[in-house]
């Protein structure tokens, strides 16, 4: 689709508060407004209803639905976004109540629409399309003529801004093809990860809330050339680059897709293969926008999602970014260790950050003597790159090397230890 599709999109944002507080709903709606802005729409008004449970037919109560219809017509609204997940029948019923010129989408459909706009790699585009076919397409069934008449738009775009396929006859076949292609890509990613493991280089993943400055930091440290915009989910595909630490060691640094509150589990699952970069990292940098008043809750969201991914036990370094803009909530660090303050935009504090990364990667190091056969010289290269070699003695069929190594490197080379501990947990 051309860009004119989203021009003139006037939207209303709707939230139903069934638990939590009105303040929580307002914070979430403010975030939804930023999502809509990223997708190219304009928020005209917001509506919040307190209700014990959502209405089965229209999510809103009948009186509130009628009120919404009045304000939609009065303000010439053509898109209504609900800050929740709507069923296909609820979307149909709401659109019938609001008029045939109004489209209704939910939070997941909006996020997927942004993903579709920003996916750059082949794998990213396939992941987005598969997620849309499983979630968005069933909510658009039978609307082909209507979408064509309305010009598609936010919530209906596929990767590359093509209109999303909604033909029921093609869906299951396309889903199977995408699942097979993505499984092959995931296997290739695992193969590449194994090859990186053999290099002995430590892996550090930058994770955190969307728009916290993850891509800006990777660009500053590695000249990665990643698009870094002041928009939500500007980066969707993970990018890995080599980064040199102060002591000369080279690590692999990865920028990952950002997190957001109320990120549906089906979206987490859809991007599991790329999020595995965080699961398999030796150290996580949790990036935080220090200037954001919601920094504390954003850390909690990030920590909860990492726990869901199985990365909750990873070593963590909290990186409070954008400190040149001021620190909104110093209390966000309460009870947390390993905290650094930087500005990825100006470079302030970045050298100290690199030094701390180096320290954390090598905590618990000890001196070990390895006996390396002459035909395994690649092992010697791993030691020189990732450890401190103190002594080397060449023999007829092997080399004995004494080096100071950390647990990660030792785990790779334990088989060559001349005096290994009886149990690996004795390290």
Predicted regions and their residues:
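Conserved nucleotide-binding/hydrolysis micro-motifs of P-loop NTPases
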Residues: 17-21, 51-53, 85-88, 109-113, ...
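Short alpha-helix plus adjacent loop in nuclease-associated cores
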Residues: 109-128
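Conserved beta-strand segments of the P-loop GTPase G domain that flank and frequently precede/overlap
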Residues: 13-17, 46-49, 81-83, 286-289, ...
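C-terminal-of-GTPase-core extension/linker across diverse P-loop GTPases
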Residues: 1-13, 33, 134, 138-212, ...
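Flexible beta-alpha connector loops of hexameric P-loop NTPases
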Residues: 19-24, 54-58, 118, 122-124, ...
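Conserved C-terminal guanine-recognition region of P-loop GTPase G domains, centered on the G4
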Residues: 27-37, 69-74, 84-102, 248-249, ...
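N-terminal accessory targeting/assembly segments
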Residues: 1-111, 417, 421, 426-427
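Switch I (effector-binding) loop of TRAFAC-class P-loop GTPase G-domains
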Residues: 189, 196-202, 220-250, 260-270, ...
